[in-house]
Amino acid sequence: MKRTYQPSKIVRKRRHGFRARMATTGGRKVLTARRSRGRKRLSA
């Protein structure tokens, strides 16, 4: 059986990276929420 998590740096950055978050309204809301919570890392 193939495992669900097949790590890839490129896919990780494209899907969850800062640029991907900034590209959509919802993504920007995610960043705002994470900033307000004082997260050390905003995105992948």
UniProtKB/Swiss-Prot annotation:
GO biological process: translation
Molecular functions per Gene Ontology: structural constituent of ribosome
Keywords: Ribonucleoprotein, Ribosomal protein
Domain of life: Bacteria
Matching HAMAP family: Ribosomal_bL34 (MF_00391)
Family per similarity comment: Belongs to the bacterial ribosomal protein bL34 family.
Protein's UniProt name: Large ribosomal subunit protein bL34
Organism: Brucella anthropi (strain ATCC 49188 / DSM 6882 / CCUG 24695 / JCM 21032 / LMG 3331 / NBRC 15819 / NCTC 12168 / Alc 37) (Ochrobactrum anthropi)
